[in-house]
Amino acid sequence: MPIPRLMCTQHPDTTVKITAAEEVDEAIVAFTAYGCDEVMVDYEGKATPYSQPKEVVMKAAKSELPLGEKFVITVRLPNPRLEEFDRAMLALEAAVVANYFSVKYMGVRAVKWVVLPMVEDVETMSLVRRMLKRKVEDYKAEAKVDVGNIEVIPLFEDAFVQLKAKALLGEVFKGEEVREVRLFLGKSDSAVKHGHLASALAIAYTLSRLGDVESELGLRIRPILGMGSPPFRGGLNNPRLAPMEVVQYAGYYTATIQSAVRYDVALEEFLKVREAILNGCCAPRQRAPDEVLHIVQEASARYRALVMKYADKVIEVARLVPSTRDRVSWTAYGRTLTGGERVVNMPRAIVYTSAWYATGLPPTLLDAPYLLELAKSDKLDLVLKVLPTYLKELEYDLEFFDRATAEKYLDGEIVKAVVELADYLGLEARPNPAYATLLRMPRNEANIIALGKYRKFLG
């Protein structure tokens, strides 16, 4: 089958609670109603049953869906460097077992790829590839079933790792014949670590240089963009922003369809997003200049220094954000943010994003002080050339900025910078009265859900 274009995921970015027991039927609906040709069963920091890929196979067989031909299941593993080793091995086993049953009952391979998240080194990637190869060989030798080759997709989720894509891919695939490989670029975790500006520039730069990587390594790279609804997480699933984001992040082949765009917006709005993503696929993009690299470094440093000032407050609010999937708590599996000599355990991206919105200051606006510096040094035009949708993203998020609430939860310094930036850009910094009313109510789980329903995404 051809490489998929729309990957349905199990992200907890919706205000609607979806249990693991409901995810098998959800996968079938993704194939049949939402037009996704790929469903990602997720084990990263998530208590997904190891039988789930097999259950999707059996449900698809019963429904007479052409799994393995038109539709495919992709499994996201835990990274054995970050979670328990046995969880990664059990997730690999779940992928191979799914193929055992799909070959046995349908004569096709349902799983052609697994995703390894948080890739930062070649060794972990090589380990997973070796273990997967052994499992496949064991099934062929002992069960007499050829479950086929399953490829490992590296997921780069850090701005500086993405900028090293050429070196990492060269190590992983050196000596292999020319073929198509899939590369997953994640926006969300990179934004948590480095801020919106740095993470957006890193992905845009990386996408613009993949042609060089293909030529030098003899590969055909098919990029996957992992992005959600808010601008901080890429905005590619946002009905208002998607037609512009596909231009900003041109060069992708596949895009994620996360939960909020399926559960928190009307079907006709989802269809607009789907159409924009499909129409924007594979468009060429201009080569980003090397000057971007210095801005990525500076923006990341400024962002991390700023977030450290407010980390305790954001963590306090984050504890109120409900989980709408059966994920492991972020206190057990979160993200590490380093600023100076301080290291802070932060929530994962969706909870983190939701918490910032609940303070009255959307996280894209944390770059405001640095953006003012860029404007004064005549470098803002370079950013806007590489990120043509950036001003629209700021304009969008200023609708959820409330000065009084942000001053209450944070302080006047960051609020002043946001207001000054909005004035400089000629944008209005004022929320809808209904949303402002919700922001000024006491924070609790119900209030955070209500804020998310208004925005049409939790985080």
Swiss-Prot record:
Entry GO MF terms: magnesium ion binding; phosphoenolpyruvate carboxylase activity
Disulfide feature: none
Catalytic activity: oxaloacetate + phosphate = phosphoenolpyruvate + hydrogencarbonate
Cofactor(s) the protein needs: Mg(2+)
Role description: Catalyzes the irreversible beta-carboxylation of phosphoenolpyruvate (PEP) to form oxaloacetate (OAA), a four-carbon dicarboxylic acid source for the tricarboxylic acid cycle.
Similarity comment: family membership: Belongs to the PEPCase type 2 family.
NCBIfam families: PEPCase_arch
Database matches in HAMAP family: PEPcase_type2
Protein name: Phosphoenolpyruvate carboxylase
Organism classification: Archaea, Thermoproteota, Thermoprotei, Thermoproteales, Thermoproteaceae
